[in-house]
Regions:
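Noncatalytic, solvent-exposed loop/strand surfaces
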Residues: 1-221
Length: 221
């Protein structure tokens, strides 16, 4: 069993009308009631071959009643209906599964019925894929410029654009997200370009906070 995990919990607001916490780790997804920690649902089977080194870094992400679970070192995505899992449906709560897409380190972003996955594998580094959360189909992909830098930061959605930061601190802005085929609209380079920038950018009062290896930047228009 893979037991090492570097993840954050995901808080979802509507599991049987109650706030709940979803955690992915040790080859399982668990849903616990936020008020008292009571277990509401549990799903295993993410590591059927008992691989020893499938640590969890990328966190699950929720949108509505669907929670998306990246696993298998970036090789798989599993979408789960939270309500069905809380009803004890087990594997029948799985809406869809893909083994051709994933994210090992960056946590996907989600909203409006879609998930945005930043792939960080050797052959797919810098590929952004928009996935329909209901049926699991890819709606579009964008390849960021290839470089030696990988991707550890999680993407940020602000308005109709997405911000994706490389390990060298360079941030790409992609959009508009509701376009048939979004494009890179901006490339922002910082002076501290030493690897590794791993912190995710966050919005702050009409600006963007970016933590590189040595510096903290506040970026405004």
């Amino acid at each position: 069993m893979a037991s090492v995990a570097w993840i954050e919990s995901v808080v979802t607001s509507d599991v049987k009308g109650e706030e709940a916490i979803a955690v992915m780790g040790a080859d399982h997804l668990t849903i616990n009631r936020a008020s008292d920690g009571k277990l509401l649902g549990k799903l295993g089977g993410f590591n059927p071959n008992q691989e020893q080194y499938w640590r969890s870094i990328s966190s699950p992400v929720a949108d509505g009643n669907i929670i998306l679970c990246p696993y298998a070192r970036g090789d798989t995505l599993t979408a789960v209906d939270i309500d069905l899992l809380a009803e004890g449906k087990g594997k029948d709560a799985i809406l869809w599964f893909r083994d051709d897409l994933g994210s090992d380190v960056p946590t996907p972003a989600a909203g409006g019925g879609r998930a945005y996955v930043v792939s960080d594998g050797k052959s797919s580094k810098g590929v952004i894929t928009c996935v329909n959360l209901v049926n699991g189909k890819s709606e579009w992909t964008v390849q960021l410029p290839k470089s030696r830098g990988g991707y550890s930061s999680s993407p940020l959605i602000a308005g109709n654009h997405m911000y994706v930061t490389q390990e060298n601190g360079t941030t790409f802005v992609l959009g508009p997200l509701n376009a048939v085929q979004p494009a890179i609209v901006s490339k922002n380079v910082v002076s501290d370009d030493e690897p590794f920038t791993v912190a995710s950018p966050i919005p702050y009062q009409e600006s963007l906070l970016l933590r590189s290896r040595h510096k903290l930047y506040r970026i405004v228009e």
